[in-house]
Every structure is written in C-alpha cells, then in structure tokens.
Amino acid sequence: MPPFRLGAVLLALTLPIVAEAQSLPDNPLSDCPDTPNCERVARGYEASPDTLYAAAERALESLGPVTLRRPDSSAARRLEAVYRVALLFKDDVAVAIRARDGGGSALYVRSASRVGHSDLGVNRRRVDRFLEAVGTALRDASSTS
C-alpha cells in the first residue's frame, strides 16, 4: 500500500478521537483498586455527547453483556453492564459520557472483576474491544449522516 494511502487510512481510523492532550472533565467513575483486575480509562472524542452515548451503547451491546442498564444521571450519561467470565465469574463495566468545554465529549470506562486478585488481562482486553467498537460505531454513524 502506498505511504499516502496508509496515512489516509490511519487518519480515518483516528478521526473520531480528539488528541489526548486536550483536557477532559474529571472522571466520574470509581478508581480501580490496587489489584490487577480492573481497568479504567478516559478518551476524548469530537462527537456530541448524544452521538457518543449511542455509539457506547451499541459497543457494549456488541460485546454480549448479561445485563445492560441505563441509569438516570443528570451529571453524566451513564451505562452499566455485567459480563460473565468463565463459568460463574462476573465483571462489571461502567461507562460515563460528559460534554467537554469547547465541544466534543469525554468517554470514561471502567471494567472490573467482582472477585479475585488478577484477571489475566481480561478487563484490559474488554476495554480495548469496547473502545474499538465505539470507534466503529462513530464511523458508521458519520457515514450514514
């Protein structure tokens, strides 16, 4: 693939994401404990809070949760999901979205195991898949509008 095409593809893949250096509102999700069974990240996007919320909802659904809740919150748009791991173990995922000063939105996600000390990277991989699915949903939304 010619270098200019590769650059165009990479630009298109990262277009919905705002540079991380720009400030994000304070993270409304709980901190992770000092154990390696939790992942908590924040990302900035150019999309409106409503568009990002819809993309996050589709992304969570695509990962096959046991349950997906949409709690009412005036401070931040929130989603909560439970995923089953192995036979009996459950992991909790929380998502919050806030408007950023100057436009765009901040997306916060926290994925944590309910029990155990280590999750062997399960929550990190889930967050990575979730963020990838959010990017895909945003690209799909922008191509249909």
Enumerate the language-model features and the residues they cover:
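Positively charged n-region of N-terminal signal peptides that target proteins for export
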Residues: 1-5
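Bacterial N-terminal signal peptides
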Residues: 7-16
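Ser/Thr-rich, low-complexity intrinsically disordered terminal regions
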Residues: 19-145
